[in-house]
Design a protein with these regions (language model features):
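Flavin-dependent oxidoreductase catalytic cores
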Residues: 1-314
Length: 314
């Protein structure tokens, strides 16, 4: 067996991954009518053929009608998606790779004049700079419905043969609850960190009840918004610990920064010409502080950088 650290198997809960290489979620914008049909399936399967241990698809699939994609994404709130998901997962598994999907509710990070023309929702009326639509302040019955929407979507994904689900938190509705900059609710879902995290944990509880223990659940989230008044590094570490201690998830997928502006987005997802792996040390700090499986993706675009990330224990 090769001594290359990238090629060593990795145990994630009940899954044995054949190496340490994962393609994290991103959206190629290939869905047809919100479904992962032939072109989408072929795009995803090629990663498995290339030898990755796991590929994550969708960036991100919508769980609710009032979370209309701003470009062509999967619609996880439709029952008809299940057989299309099954065709894709079967094809990936035949190539020896695991497959997960990323689910989200966009909250304010979308527009009302798309999809079904429904009001967009957030824990405050503050609009996002990038999308600029003013959200309705979320109400109790909205929260209950959206939690159920996440659970329903999770059940569909398991029925479709997925190995797990990753919740997209940063910048989207879950993060809008967690961040003090975007949460102006009173009562059980606003104010203290415990309250601001309640929505996220309630979503995971509902999903776990549907999918059982033999299914991977994780979260891609920001542990430092790098914004005055937002989630800072110290609070981000506490969020990370609380996510682990909840017992509801199996890994963390950590990023640093914010995506509500174009400059902020390029710091989180660096473009060509920018520094490689700018947040790798930060992700390593989260892993060290939590002693918990930690994923990270932010311009780790070459084998040498990826190998260093694993070999150095980051």
């Amino acid at each position: 067996m090769s001594n290359d650290p990238l090629l060593q198997p990795y145990r994630l809960k009940h899954l044995t991954l054949r190496n340490r290489i994962i393609v994290t979620s991103h959206e190629p914008a290939y869905p047809e009518d919100g479904m992962p049909k032939g072109r989408y399936r072929a795009y995803t399967v090629e990663r498995a053929k290339g030898g990755v241990a796991m590929t994550m698809t969708a960036g991100s699939a919508a769980v609710s009608k009032d979370s209309p994609p701003v470009f062509n994404n999967l619609l996880a709130y439709k029952d008809e998606i299940v057989p299309w998901i099954r065709e894709m997962t079967d094809a990936v598994h035949e190539e020896g790779a695991a497959i997960m999907i990323q689910l989200t509710h966009l909250g304010r990070r979308t527009r009302w004049d798309k999809g079904d023309w429904l009001p967009i929702l957030a824990p405050s009326h503050h609009r996002e700079s990038a999308h600029r639509a003013f959200p309705k302040k979320i109400e109790d019955w909205d929260i209950e419905r959206i939690i159920k929407d996440f659970a329903d979507a999770a059940e569909r994904m398991k029925a479709g043969g997925m190995d797990g689900i990753e919740l997209e938190a940063y910048g989207h509705l879950i993060d809008q609850f967690v961040s003090p900059l975007t949460n102006e609710l009173d009562g059980p879902y606003g104010g203290s960190l415990e309250n601001r995290m309640r929505f996220c944990l309630d979503v995971f509880k509902a999903m776990r009840e549907r999918v059982g223990d033999d299914f991977i659940l994780g979260v891609r989230y920001t542990a430092d918004e790098c914004l005055e008044g937002g989630t800072g590094k110290a609070e981000g570490l506490e969020i990370s610990r609380r996510l682990k201690d909840s017992g509801l998830i199996d890994y963390l997928n950590v990023i640093r920064g914010h995506i509500d502006t174009d400059p902020g987005l390029t710091d989180v997802i660096p473009i060509q010409g920018m520094t490689s792996a700018p947040h790798l040390d930060f992700a390593g700090e989260i892993r060290a502080a939590t002693s918990f499986p930690t994923f990270h993706a932010a311009k780790i675009q070459d084998v040498a950088t990826a190998r260093y990330a694993i070999a150095s224990g980051k």
